[in-house]
């Protein structure tokens, strides 16, 4: 058993007790820094990362670690299958550093609409139901696709079953999502989801 410490965007530290073997899903794992925190606390981690440059490092980092399963896929709330993943506009400078900014949201203000790769997307609610194991923590940092995803997790009933859900929202970089993000915040509050934190990072 270990303690996982996550810093929230108000600089407070949230401590989560992780029992050995409990499951965590890391959506938007990038090169695995948060994945590593969960794994070090004793969790089994399922890490999703669609960006090929970040995934190469992620996979190499955990290739001999049986507690971490890495998938070169993104997660969505609807329309699974192939989608365009747009690269950060500064991707040409450093493909790893700027891999954190890649997004399936074409209107994100720091992506290059002409530079993208086709990536496989899975519907997370369906994945979790088929996985059929208790999930202790769900971390979501998927550059704008979190609105669609989280609404589907709530619609499907999956969100009620996960004790800790941490989400980074991106309405500052995607102004078109401001109303949807506000609606999501209101829904989380009005429907009494105390397990969903929309202020992570």
Range-by-range predicted roles:
Residues 1-201:
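Phosphate/nucleotide-binding beta-alpha loop and adjacent structural elements of enzyme active sites
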